């Protein structure tokens, strides 16, 4: 299975780590290039290659069946646990795993690879972190949730239980409600037994990524995939 197309930003120095970050519903990989640009402007994480995959164009029930960039179908946001597209989610997990393999085949150790995403991309990244048997360097989940919880609870393994995880959510998020973020955090810690979860909540932040959050992410990346 070939990986999805992606925006790839090479490391400025010797390439020893990779960040793979998935955008949200209706967005694009280019829409998250600012993470790499902020790091480059500050001369930070020069050893890191950034990959921003592009979701395929597909019909989305929430959008009246119209085609848009989407990692899986979404029927409603009022209850993110209702009628989930398990097949589509697992297909995107497989695509993300193929991107991880692309990097390990190129010589980057898996424990120097961080996966992450925003909103729908967060859901795919969290599912991947729970299900993969590859030991990762870190997992970043922004303004999202753990999807297909029953499946993940029955199929997850302990490979990444002590892998550093950065979870963040805005308190004023009206798309993926803040409560869903907290419930997912609690599920990850209490049910899946992840031991190294770094939780951040941002007062007044809507369904977006703020400057304070960007700074916190870059600091966290520097700490967990040191040069």
UniProtKB/Swiss-Prot annotation:
First-listed, main subcellular location of the protein, grouped into a coarse class: cytoplasm
Keyword field contains Hydrolase: yes
EC number, UniProt record: 3.1.2.-, 3.1.2.22
Catalytic activity of the protein: S-hexadecanoyl-L-cysteinyl-[protein] + H2O = L-cysteinyl-[protein] + hexadecanoate + H(+)
An example Gene Ontology molecular-function term: palmitoyl-(protein) hydrolase activity
Keywords: Cytoplasm, Fatty acid metabolism, Hydrolase, Lipid metabolism, Nucleus, Serine esterase
Compartments, as annotated in UniProt: Cytoplasm; Nucleus
InterPro entries: AB_hydrolase_fold (IPR029058), LYPA1-2/EST-like (IPR050565), PLipase/COase/thioEstase (IPR003140)
GO cellular component terms attached to this protein's record: cytoplasm; nucleus
Biological process per Gene Ontology, one example term: fatty acid metabolic process
Pfam families noted in UniProt: Abhydrolase_2
Function: Hydrolyzes fatty acids from S-acylated cysteine residues in proteins with a strong preference for palmitoylated G-alpha proteins over other acyl substrates. Mediates the deacylation of G-alpha proteins such as GPA1 in vivo, but has weak or no activity toward palmitoylated Ras proteins. Has weak lysophospholipase activity in vitro; however such activity may not exist in vivo.
Family: Belongs to the AB hydrolase superfamily. AB hydrolase 2 family.
Record-linked PANTHER family: LYSOPHOSPHOLIPASE-LIKE PROTEIN 1, LYSOPHOSPHOLIPASE-RELATED
Protein name: Acyl-protein thioesterase 1
Organism (species): Yarrowia lipolytica (strain CLIB 122 / E 150) (Yeast)
